[in-house]
Regions:
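Intrinsically disordered or highly flexible coil/loop and linker segments, enriched in small
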Residues: 44, 195, 244, 261, ...
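Auxiliary tRNA-acceptor-end handling modules of aminoacyl-tRNA synthetases
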Residues: 3-90, 94-98, 543, 563-566, ...
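Long, charged, mostly alpha-helical binding arms that flank functional sites
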Residues: 331-408, 412
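Short, well-ordered alpha-helical packing segments
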Residues: 128, 155-162, 183-190, 236, ...
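NTP-dependent nucleotidyl-transfer catalytic core
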Residues: 18-289, 330-336
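Active-site cores that bind ATP or allylic diphosphates and position pyrophosphate for catalysis
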Residues: 174, 192-351, 409, 418, ...
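Glycine- and acidic
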Residues: 106-113, 139-144, 299-307, 365-371, ...
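Core subunits and conserved enzymes of cellular information-processing
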Residues: 312-316, 320-322, 389-391, 399-641
Length: 641
């Protein structure tokens, strides 16, 4: 114990481990110093608030209203979210009560025509989570009824995202598994006089459904009067390729007088002959529509609760009508509000435009809100599920600001990833009287289970350019000429004695310094990286891809709203040697689809760069070059939408 007490490195390590981040200045300071600063700011804020309240009262009195300003609400304490909360209460609890079942069966039925986005994460969490909570199972069913838009890469990516979020499908099925069964039921519909072959074009169909504004009387087309035998023959002719696409289609004979458009004789089968199906090849020339396929596949698979978003509320009527008409098992469809996010675009067409214009690197660009983009950025899967759970599930559409999503991610990372020291824009500092020393650093000041690692303090270190000023000021507490600042976990604070500049660029290239052994507790501490074991990395700082919350409303279209600072690259950043152990022990954390050591891609190597941001390794990294993506900042960026 005596040796430890005499060791300045040990004392400083113990002392600096208790430092806290001043979020306003980005400095690490002692608890006492932070308390003083916060008190000063609170006093200033209270003064400004009192003045504003006084002005408001004066204004109100002048208007004949002397009511005092309302008291501010107390800030609620942070509550740890129950990961099963959305199934225990509210909408999903009521859904289960409507049809309680010992054998809950749900399904997630995406179309394999694009990459999933953040909204699909809610659908995955709701359907798989509902089944899991009630001890049931969930199918992953590909709704592969449109060969013109389906590609193998989408099938693969969808399954990967489901598993990455921590869910295992009970079975992976395809609507195309049931093509023959669906066809047979379509013929049965004809024999029941509940379907007919129609030759009408778009203009005629619009007239039948009430015209341009829906003000005219609705009526059924003359083709509905054909006999069962005629319709059967013509439907078989469609199957045999005797019609070209759009020359004929099979319609359900529903109720054209019903006020619900989903009962206006919807299409059941259409002709598609230009592209082979990814699984059945050229076997079929006709394909069932979503409205015909979806409810029947739910029935075939014994789905108990068919959970979908509220744009399908009207479809519930046709869903139930078709199952009843055919006399098959009837699942229960219920609808919840979808998840949207402002400040970005989720449309496949618009994202494709961004890719084609090379505004982003691809569908997995970390600035996009595709799930593969969010994953590449380094957002942990469990954080996404926490976000969905925090929002809850109701019948209202949730349109959320990006900052709300990032708050959840930040809160999750704070307690689950290790801390390392890193500098984005390094300046060399030569400490003239320093000796090499070992410094032990905890990976987390709050979680001892994360362990610790040892780095080497060296006479030459690197600090961030943002932590040095050539001209000092009273309100600046970091390094400046003849000024002292603490280096996190270093033996002593340092004082800058001189600096050198590049004559061409005017940038500082080197700072000379000495230990300041007289100053026991500097007002601020900054991070540093030594020369031994450190690594050069490329750090990509991702900001919002768009300048506004509503890029679609921008004059000239969403492409005119691109933020020119959406990606800022630091090509020469440095990270300390503890990175090697963090990489070896990934994933951070072990949760959801990254539940075991070694599971997860490079993005599962996550950490907090002290005083900088949260980062993850990018998939562009190689053995010779490490590339990091900023996941989120340490605090909400000022001015962020």
């Amino acid at each position: 114990m005596a040796d430890a007490a005499a060791d300045p490195t040990a004392k400083l390590t113990e002392s600096t481990a208790k430092l806290q981040l001043d979020e306003e200045t980005g400095e690490m300071v002692s608890k006492g110093e932070l308390k003083k600063r916060m008190a000063k700011r609170a006093k200033k804020a209270a003064s400004e608030k009192a003045k504003a309240a006084k002005d408001a009262v004066a204004k109100a009195v002048g208007a004949g209203d002397s009511k005092p300003a309302p008291k501010p609400k107390a800030k609620p304490e942070e509550v740890v979210m129950d990961p099963e909360a959305m199934f225990k209460q509210g909408f999903l609890q009521e859904v289960y009560k409507e049809r309680p079942s010992e054998n809950v069966v749900t399904r997630f039925p995406p179309e394999p025509n694009g990459y999933l986005h953040i909204g699909h994460a809610k659908a995955i969490a709701v359907n798989f989570g509902f089944a899991k909570y009630h001890g049931g199972v969930c199918y992953l069913r590909y709704d592969d009824t449109n060969p013109e838009k389906e590609e193998e890469r989408y099938f693969t990516a969808i399954e990967e995202m489901v598993r990455w979020l921590g869910f295992t499908p009970y079975k992976i099925t395809y609507s195309s598994d049931n093509f023959q069964k669906l066809y047979d039921l379509a013929e049965k519909m004809i024999t029941l006089e509940k379907a007919y072959v129609c030759y009408c074009g778009d203009t005629e169909i619009k007239l039948q459904r009430g015209g341009e504004k829906g003000a005219s009387p609705r009526f059924r087309c003359e083709h509905a009067n054909h006999t069962v035998e005629e319709n059967l023959q013509k439907f078989r002719d469609m199957k045999d390729g005797k019609y070209k696409p759009r020359e004929a289609f099979l319609r359900m004979k529903q109720d054209i007088t019903d006020g619900n458009p989903q009962m206006w004789d919807l299409a059941a089968y259409r002709i598609k002959t230009d592209t082979p199906h990814h699984r059945t090849g050229w076997d079929w020339k006709i394909y069932p529509t979503y409205d015909f396929t979806h409810c029947l596949c739910d029935s075939f698979e014994g789905i108990t609760h068919s959970l979908c978003t509220t744009e399908f509320v009207q479809s519930r009527v046709s869903y139930e009508w078709l199952n009843k008409t055919l006399g098959v098992y009837e699942p229960m469809q219920r609808e919840y509000g979808r998840l949207g996010i402002t400040g970005t675009v989720l449309s496949k067409r618009k994202i494709l435009k961004l890719v084609e214009e090379k505004i982003v690197r691809g569908w997995d660009d970390p600035r996009l809100y595709t799930l593969i983009g969010i994953k590449r950025r380094g957002v942990p899967p469990r954080a996404i599920l926490d976000f969905v759970n925090e929002l809850g599930v109701t019948t209202s559409v949730s349109v959320i600001q990006i900052k709300r999503f990032e708050q959840t991610v930040r809160k999750y990372l704070e307690r689950t990833v290790p801390r390392l020291m890193m500098v984005l824009d390094p300046i060399r500092v030569v400490i003239e009287d320093a000796e090499p020393a070992d410094v032990e650093l905890a990976f987390s000041p709050k979680d001892p289970n994360m362990g610790s690692h040892t780095i080497k303090f060296t006479p030459t270190v690197y600090i961030d350019r943002a932590d040095f000023r050539e001209v000092d000021s009273k309100d600046y507490f970091r390094l400046a000429p003849n000024k002292t600042v603490g280096l996190l976990n270093a033996p002593f604070p340092i004082k800058a004695t001189s600096y050198t500049k590049d004559e061409t660029t005017g940038k500082v290239t080197e700072i000379r310094a000495v230990f300041d052994k007289e100053t026991k507790k500097p007002k601020a501490y900054i991070n540093w990286v030594g020369t031994e074991g450190s690594k050069k990395v490329e750090a990509r700082i991702h900001n919002s891809l768009f300048k506004s919350e509503k890029p679609d409303d921008a004059e000239g279209g969403f492409l005119n709203d691109i933020n020119p600072e959406s990606e800022v690259i630091y090509p020469d950043a440095l990270i300390e040697s503890g990175f090697d152990e963090v990489k070896r022990r990934a994933p951070w954390p072990e949760a959801a689809g990254e539940s075991e050591l070694g599971m997860g891609g490079p993005e599962s190597v996550r950490f907090q760069a002290t005083r900088v941001a949260y980062f993850a390794v990018d998939s562009d990294s190689t053995d010779d070059k490490i590339i990091l993506n900023r996941i989120v900042s340490l605090k909400e960026d000022a001015g962020k939408v």
